[in-house]
């Protein structure tokens, strides 16, 4: 299946299949009761989501939205869990997938624990370039989303981006 920028793959709270992201980039947002959205995760190529449902079914934690054009395989839940039961060696493959995700989260922790806001932003921009080049971070995320992801205010992100543009 092909998803274009801005299209939704699944909605928070629903249940359904798992998905393998072949190419592209997805964001996972949590929608609160007041309607506000918080960016909680980014999904990169070769991830199978939702992560919390790889071993047993669970409703979707957030809403998945394409940041750029994505190619996605639909993995029917019943088939996925039956194959796990029939082939216990697949649990090792799932453990390796989760290990990769944990390593990515460690990189994210490194980004958000940088001392200066400018360095936090620089590290996030460098990480994103591996997935979206030649596009830029601001081509796929709003300043609010960048701020949410880095634990900074939108105003700080705006100031840092203007400073970067002025120094080029």
Where are the model-predicted features located?
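Regulatory nucleotide-sensing modules
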Residues: 1-23
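Phosphate-/nucleic-acid-contacting segments
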Residues: 120, 124-168
């Amino acid at each position: 299946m092909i998803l274009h920028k801005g299209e939704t793959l699944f909605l928070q709270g629903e249940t359904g299949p798992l998905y393998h992201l072949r190419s592209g980039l997805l964001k996972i947002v949590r929608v609160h009761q007041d309607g506000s959205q918080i960016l909680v995760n980014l999904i990169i190529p070769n991830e199978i989501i939702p992560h919390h449902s790889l071993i047993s079914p669970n409703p979707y934690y957030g809403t998945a939205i394409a940041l750029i054009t994505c190619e996605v395989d639909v993995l029917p839940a019943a088939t996925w869990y039956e194959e796990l039961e029939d082939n216990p060696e697949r649990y090792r493959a799932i453990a390796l997938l989760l290990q990769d995700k944990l390593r990515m989260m460690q990189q994210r922790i490194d980004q958000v624990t940088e001392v200066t806001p400018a360095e936090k932003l620089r590290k996030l921009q460098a990480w994103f370039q591996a997935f979206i080049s030649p596009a830029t971070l601001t081509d796929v995320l709003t300043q609010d989303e960048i701020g949410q992801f880095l634990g900074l205010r939108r105003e700080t992100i705006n100031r840092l981006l203007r400073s970067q543009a002025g120094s080029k």
